Design a protein with these regions (language model features):
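Peripheral, non-cofactor segments flanking catalytic/redox cores
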Residues: 1-99
Length: 99
């Protein structure tokens, strides 16, 4: 039986492979309605990915100490690890806490 870590990595690998396949397609060949439908599906997927991101951030900030990751605050850790601004990191943490 695979561990949850292995299953998570396999699922993420599959998602990345699917993205590469989609990105390689000649999207300019789609009709306008097809492009609109694709945009709708991508928006839905983006919302799901954002929700998962906030869930993980919420778990990190409630379960751990940012000092263990080399930061005085979680915003410092996330901004460094994710290469985002400290303000963006604070916004994501606030969203995670309110979810």
């Amino acid at each position: 039986m695979s561990s949850i870590r292995e299953k998570t990595i396999a699922a993420l690998d599959a998602a990345e492979a699917s993205y590469r396949k989609l990105a390689a397609l000649p999207l300019e060949a789609l009709t306008r309605p097809d492009k609109q439908a694709l945009l709708n599906r991508l928006e839905e997927l983006d919302k799901k990915m954002t929700a998962l991101d906030r869930r993980l951030i919420g778990q990190l900030v409630t379960e751990g100490d940012p000092a263990l990751f080399g930061g005085a605050a979680w915003a410092d850790v996330l901004s460094r690890r994710l290469r985002i601004s400290r303000g963006e990191a604070q916004r994501r943490i606030a969203e995670a806490r309110s979810a």
